[in-house]
Amino acid sequence: MNDKTTSLHANVDQHEIDKFESVASRWWDLEGEFKPLHRINPLRLNYIQERADGLFGKKVLDVGCGGGILSESMARVGAEVTGLDMGKEPLEVARLHSLETGIPVTYIQDTVENHAAEYPQRYDVVTCMEMLEHVPDPSSIVRSCAKLVKPGGHVFFSTINRNKKAWFMLVVGAEYILNMVPKGTHDANKFIRPSELLSWVDETNLRSKNMIGLHYNPITDKFRLAPNVDVNYMVHTQATDNSDL
């Protein structure tokens, strides 16, 4: 496992970093603050594998990897994974967990913009899950992900729609009624409409291939994928020729 740390603080919301650093030690607690991420991870992984025609042997970058839940799961199925994040504590947790499990993942503390400048067209697959709504300029993240992927490669985004339903479900419901995540986890003003995300995608060499919603049923306590993108949603894009970037 190789590590690299670079000090660069552009397009970083320190409040968001601090928020996740404060609970980083419990990242791999299946019943803790990150329980929803553990619950949805099989759905995310299956979607990525199916849309990218498998991950075995592919170079994958997980942008905003946090404590490494998705990163490790992709490495477990044979991908060569690099996890990128600006949170020092979550990365330390990710590195320790990788050592414990023996699943190799390279973790780097850096911004995606800087990583894109250093490693253009390096990866077969780039994932950016539950991260866009936590940065000052999400469109910059989209552009950088586009630069990092090889021509023909796949980029996956997931975020939260900005509307009253999403606010009620994720802020009122998940934070205050069901206590699924810590209070203050979400800032509804930073939620991103699908039309906004797709407009940023269209400004790059990426082309949207699929969009799917992620749904939680509080009665059955189950997550599932479905066409409705009113709340949580994922977008699969594929790169064309990067020469114009």
Swiss-Prot record:
It is an enzyme of class 2 (transferase). GO terms for biological process: methylation. It comes from the Bacteria. One of its GO terms (molecular function) is 2-polyprenyl-6-hydroxyphenol methylase activity. The keyword Methyltransferase applies. Keywords: Methyltransferase, S-adenosyl-L-methionine, Transferase, Ubiquinone biosynthesis. It catalyses: a 3-demethylubiquinol + S-adenosyl-L-methionine = a ubiquinol + S-adenosyl-L-homocysteine + H(+); a 3-(all-trans-polyprenyl)benzene-1,2-diol + S-adenosyl-L-methionine = a 2-methoxy-6-(all-trans-polyprenyl)phenol + S-adenosyl-L-homocysteine + H(+). Pfam families: Methyltransf_23 (PF13489). InterPro entries: SAM-dependent_MTases_sf, UbiG_MeTrfase. Its EC number is 2.1.1.222, 2.1.1.64. Pathway: Cofactor biosynthesis; ubiquinone biosynthesis. S-adenosyl-L-methionine binds at residues 44, 64, 85, 129. Belongs to the methyltransferase superfamily. UbiG/COQ3 family. O-methyltransferase that catalyzes the 2 O-methylation steps in the ubiquinone biosynthetic pathway. This is Ubiquinone biosynthesis O-methyltransferase. It comes from Proteus mirabilis (strain HI4320).
